[in-house]
């Protein structure tokens, strides 16, 4: 059996298709996060981006997301090593740290549904869309105690 590409290649060596396939579809990147201006600490919310599809846990306009959502962060092999808010379960983060993917990742399980079945994704856990919130202070109502 051939060794999986994420165990043999660096992030920089991956093809665009391999890179995109690393996304486990959890949807956590698409949640609004709050940053404490004094400490830099990141606080998670249950507020989804305006383009977030809460059923699929994917972007509804992935190809145009960076143009349509100014705060959207396009992940690259370079920035996944420095973005502190990437979830601890994020495949990009795991591979960058030299760790293996979890059993529920679609590249391991063979199914895009296992991330949902394992309770890792945000399916059913997003409580609002950023389009629902009138004031910046409204985000505080959706703060989570920990990383989802």
From Swiss-Prot:
One Pfam family from the record: CxxCxxCC
The stretch of residues making up the signal peptide is: none
Similarity field: Belongs to the UPF0260 family.
Q: What is this protein called?
A: UPF0260 protein mll2411
